[in-house]
A protein has these predicted regions:
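Short, functionally important secondary-structure microenvironments
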Residues: 1-81, 87-189
Length: 189
């Protein structure tokens, strides 16, 4: 069974409000507030830490770990999409539901489900640019998902769940993992 690397919480840094990456994160958080206030409330309540121990963004059941270089490589729309994607992992209790499962395969199944949820909710498709969303009396807001994030248009949000996707034989481990990977910081999903 695959294992995720351990994230040493004691060496991870709390956000510095003056840092470029935290300013970028805050702008995306404001976009999330415009798009979905529920997700904004969640992002405000979940502690986040910056660390080089993860390749992108990794979540546990109650924390977010962020690689500074990774978020610096994303557009604002992509970062907004990735943050929402990672919030889905936390809010759907994927960490807990994945206990006893292969963490890499479980994460991929969850990623596929989340990508389809985001496609149906916001119109996003990984690597296809950003989507402009606006509502009456609202600032136009953009959301996107970076190239390489798993997506399967055949997944049904109504009929599928990550557990069902996990059991499918055609869902195999990717050759390399997408950078914004979730999983338990202790190594077990």
């Amino acid at each position: 069974m695959g294992r995720r690397p351990f994230v040493d919480v004691t060496t991870a840094e709390k956000p510095d409000p003056q840092s470029a990456e935290e300013k970028q994160f805050s702008l995306s958080a404001l976009d999330i507030k415009r798009l979905c206030p529920f997700f904004y409330a969640a992002i405000c309540m979940i502690p986040r830490f910056y660390t080089d121990q993860v390749p992108g963004i990794r979540v546990t059941a109650d924390k977010i770990f962020i690689n500074r270089r990774y978020i610096g490589s994303l557009s604002r729309a992509e970062l907004t999409g990735v943050i929402i994607h990672e919030l889905y992992h936390i809010l759907m209790s994927h960490n807990v539901r994945g206990a006893g499962k292969d963490p890499v395969r479980w994460n991929r199944a969850c990623d596929l489900y989340i990508s389809k949820c985001m496609n149906e909710t916001f119109g996003t498709v990984p690597g296809k640019g950003s989507v402009s969303l606006s509502m009456p009396d609202m600032v136009k807001t953009y959301i996107g998902l970076p190239e390489g994030m798993p997506f399967d248009a055949g997944i049904s949000v109504e009929k599928d769940i990550p557990e069902k996707i996990y059991l499918r034989h055609e869902i195999e481990e990717p050759e390399h993992e997408f950078n914004a990977s979730s999983g338990d910081a202790g190594g077990a999903s």
